[in-house]
Amino acid sequence: MDDHSPRDAAETPAPGPAATPAKRVYETPPTSRPITDAEAARAEKLAANEHIKIASGYLRGTLADGLLKHATGAISEDDGQLVKFHGMYLQDDRDLRPERTKKKLDKAYSFMIRLRIAGGVITPKQWLILDDIARTYAGGALRATTRQTFQYHGVIKSNLKRTMAAIDGALLDTIAACGDVNRNVMAATNPAQTGAHKAAYQLAKDISDSLLPKTSAWREIWLDGERVVGGEDEAEVEPVYGRTYLPRKFKTVVAVPPSNEVDIFAHDLGFIAILDKKNQVTGWNVTVGGGMGMTHGEPDTFPRTADVMGFVKPEDALKVAEAVMTVQRDWGNRKNRKNARLKYTIERYGLDAFRAEVEKRVGKKLGAPKPFTFTGNGDRYGWVEGDDGRHHLTLYVPSGRIKDIDGGPQFLSGLRRIAEVHQGDFRLTGNQNVIIANVPAEKRAEIDALVDEYGLTRGASALRRSSLACVALPTCGLALAESERYLPDLMTELEESLASHGLAEEEITIRSTGCPNGCARPFISEIGLVGRGPERYHLYLGAAHDGSRLSKLYKEDVAASEIRDTLDPLFADYARGRQPGEHFGDYLIRAGHVARTTNGPDFHDRTGALKPATLG
């Protein structure tokens, strides 16, 4: 695991083995709150989204009127930005675009709806309602995301309010699942650590509730609620966020070592549980400044792994979470959204200054970080008994797509039948899988019988168990290449290659995204594929197996048909030269195939293969 202890973030090594760290000069942090006046925003040339938020009336915009316009399945461009805060994206079926364009038809518009499910825990009753929604409004599919929640795809505009009412009926919502806010809060799911999971889940839920936008716009628009009377006083309507919310998305996770299945270093804010000998939480290490997204061809954008900023007692964790988020609210870049995430804020002003401001807002110093160790970021498949005697079954769900597959697993129907008899709860994992959790010992046989009856998968090959893919085409408007629809075929090819070198059971993380936004966190995967164009990908290698170190660009613009041939000699070399217990990403660096990435600022340095790879 790479060291993420606090350091002077200014000391960024230049390329080369003998480079001397150079002291960076940081900018002076701002001292004022974000601009909320329209004229001042124009004068300062703030990003377009800032103007939209200022004029939105706390996320209302013209959404209510737009829903009544039946001549189009879309909404206005400005409302398309605001609806994200309500948990939705306007999309269209890109497979149908050419034919519809030829016929001079409007795009096949629909909406993706994302739920807010802190910690990924839902009851069987909620599962059944979500299943009904999937069958009625979303083409018979639920999608477990890489951030422990569900998405619906293909919901048309005329069904939006009915869908939202059904979600509300499950005592769930979609508020802040997208947008410039604190999004769904993830929590560790390791079923063997029952006590620690309870603490992690509770912290995730507390943060989610505390940092939730307070505007009543969601209930007014989607559930026909009455507008709350009381004026537009910022302190009253949004006491934490203010009128303009955050500069950009903000993602929070809670991890429990030794498992890093939430990929804590890839997120803006994280809490790492520090456990005593009885597996009880004594406090939390706080991480800040992680994030995956970047833009092809723009080196001032980069992924970054989070720094461990300090240690807090359990009673201070919530105050620290709010302080970190509000510093980002006030310091984040509101002129350039490509440099607006917390990772860039810390690079701009320095970790020391950021920590000092957090401590000022909390009213006390953070403690020194406590030792911790992560050993991987995968799930534990099959049955696991928790330390309270309850049982937990983790099912492998390819790319999180819960639907009935012709000639294959009947995920939607099978999990519905399980929900009808299950007495515990369900947990979604950050690896897009489902845990049937808290099963009494006497109910295991009944669950097993249903799993077998519907062909549900308890596991898969080592490579597939360690895989993630974003949705990409046909619904994501940002996708440059296939991801979810392509990765299974690629893994079949790579499984053959790995088996030929005696590596069939070697755990190697592989992740694919259709664009460099990195929703499946490819830049902390030992093999990362990032869409560059139709059937072309950038290939990234050399990340840490536990998600603690970024990868490096190994080869640009690789044709899909060439990926196996590119990786095969590297697999051969790994099989010949690895040390006991050495992971693929670590070996590629030690053997000199690819340079080590220290952190975000040097992500674009020393790219490419450092030496030829051969089979012989």
UniProtKB/Swiss-Prot annotation:
Biased composition, class Low complexity, residue ranges: 11-22
Keywords: 4Fe-4S, Amino-acid biosynthesis, Cysteine biosynthesis, Heme, Iron, Iron-sulfur, Metal-binding, NADP, Oxidoreductase
Pathway: Sulfur metabolism; hydrogen sulfide biosynthesis; hydrogen sulfide from sulfite (NADPH route): step 1/1
Binding residues for [4Fe-4S] cluster: C470, C476, C515, C519
Required co-factors: siroheme; [4Fe-4S] cluster
Single GO BP term: hydrogen sulfide biosynthetic process
Protein's UniProt keywords contain Lyase: no
Gene3D superfamilies referenced in this protein's UniProt entry, alphabetically: Sulfite Reductase Hemoprotein, domain 1
Region entry Disordered, spans: 1-35
Gene Ontology molecular function, alphabetical: 4 iron, 4 sulfur cluster binding; heme binding; metal ion binding; NADP binding; sulfite reductase (ferredoxin) activity; sulfite reductase (NADPH) activity
Pfam family, one: NIR_SIR
Entry's Gene Ontology cellular component terms: sulfite reductase complex (NADPH)
Catalytic activity: hydrogen sulfide + 3 NADP(+) + 3 H2O = sulfite + 3 NADPH + 4 H(+)
Cofactor binding, per record: Binds 1 siroheme per subunit.
Glycosyltransferase listed as a keyword: no
Amino acid composition bias (Basic and acidic residues), ranges on this chain: 1-10
PANTHER family reported for this sequence: SULFITE REDUCTASE [NADPH] SUBUNIT BETA, SULFITE REDUCTASE [NADPH] SUBUNIT BETA-RELATED
Homology family: Belongs to the nitrite and sulfite reductase 4Fe-4S domain family.
Subunit structure: Alpha(8)-beta(8). The alpha component is a flavoprotein, the beta component is a hemoprotein.
Entry function: Component of the sulfite reductase complex that catalyzes the 6-electron reduction of sulfite to sulfide. This is one of several activities required for the biosynthesis of L-cysteine from sulfate.
The protein, known as: Sulfite reductase [NADPH] hemoprotein beta-component
Species, as recorded: Methylobacterium radiotolerans (strain ATCC 27329 / DSM 1819 / JCM 2831 / NBRC 15690 / NCIMB 10815 / 0-1)
Gene behind the chain: cysI
